[in-house]
A protein has these predicted regions:
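Sec-dependent N-terminal signal peptides
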Residues: 3-13
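Carbohydrate-active catalytic/glycan-binding domains of CAZyme proteins
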Residues: 19-323
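Acyl-donor-binding surface of acyltransferase catalytic domains
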Residues: 16
Length: 323
């Protein structure tokens, strides 16, 4: 018995020392939850709590367009609110819509992720103008920029220029001491890591092929136990064996030698409701985390059931304390 206890203690200490103590288990979801709009495709979804209200920033475009490609020309970013982190959320306003064609984001805005940096709210997103195309293709060039506000309700001041000049998507931001770390991917789903002293830039690329083994997208980055973690979509199943499931990778130095976390799967395509019915999502993407007082409390994903799309927050059974 003594030897068994010692062995168990060694295993627990070893697991904690290497940081392998993060598990994403979820509670059942209320039927009346999330953020939906009857006439729009809703995608992405990033939540921040301000006082007693939860503010969700999401992308939308009219259902008269196509899914998913319709966002490339018609997406805009909106804000919705709820007293509950799982919703249902109510539409409040358009935050980032069309503007003068001289700007980098005049045509489209997508992939919002909201953060509080100092005394400002900073909304990172991708955008495109009306005339700049990617490599002579039919697709407009997408680039990362930001908007700032002193109040979560605005007014929002948009950056005059993008912070990443090349094709860039799926921005994920980590405030790491005095540094800002930015994860993004290009059109081929090659993953980049960049760093800056200020969220406005300039950004220096510190890793230009973070996960060369396969294609990843839709990132969220955080730190725990002095290790850097990324939650993302396994686009072709090269990490976990399942196409488009959510997976977890990490790095000790936060720059290189990224590895699979154990457990590697964060979520699959099934959402279980409180009435025990199961939604088998056609697509479940764009994972974002809700962090309150240094603890991960919910995951937010965009879901598609074959007809409608919406943002679906799901509560964790056990919160995850991060640093």
């Amino acid at each position: 018995m003594k030897h068994l206890l010692i062995t168990l203690m060694v295993l627990v200490l070893s697991r904690t020392a290497t940081g392998q103590d993060i598990t994403f288990d979820f509670v059942k979801v209320p039927r009346e939850s999330g953020f939906k709009m009857d006439d729009y495709f809703i995608w992405c979804g990033s939540i921040i709590k301000v006082d007693t209200v939860y503010h969700l920033f999401a992308s939308r475009w009219k259902k008269s367009g196509s899914f998913p490609e319709g966002y490339r020309q018609n997406s805009e970013i909106v804000r919705a609110t709820s007293k509950s982190p799982v919703g249902p959320f109510r539409f409040e306003e358009i935050v980032i819509g069309e503007r003068d064609s001289s700007f980098w984001d005049s045509n489209m805005a997508h992939n919002p992720t909201i953060h509080k940096i100092g005394d400002e709210y900073v909304l990172f997103y991708i955008g495109s103008d009306f005339t700049t195309y990617l490599n002579n293709s039919k697709n407009l060039l997408r680039r990362i920029g930001f908007a700032t506000a002193k109040s979560i309700a605005g007014p929002w001041k948009r950056s005059d220029e993008p912070i990443i000049k090349t094709e860039s998507n799926n921005p994920a931001v980590l405030i790491d001491g005095r540094k800002i770390k930015l994860v993004f991917r290009d059109e081929s789903l090659r993953v980049f890591l960049a760093e800056a002293d200020d969220y406005k830039g300039p950004y220096k690329i510190t890793n230009d092929n973070l996960w060369p083994e396969c294609e990843l997208e839709d990132f969220y980055i955080f730190k725990k136990n002095n290790q850097t973690h990324i939650i993302c979509e396994d686009n072709v199943g090269g990490v976990c064996g399942h196409e488009r499931w959510g997976v977890h990778i990490f790095s000790v130095d936060g720059v290189s030698n990224w590895k699979k976390y154990d457990p590697v799967v964060v979520y699959n395509h099934d959402i279980i409701f409180e009435d025990n019915t199961v939604l088998h999502c056609n697509r479940r993407e764009r994972p974002q985390l809700l962090i309150i007082n240094g603890e991960i409390t919910h995951i937010i994903t965009a879901v598609y059931d074959g007809k409608d799309t919406w943002c679906q927050p799901v509560e964790l059974k056990h919160t995850i304390k991060i640093n």
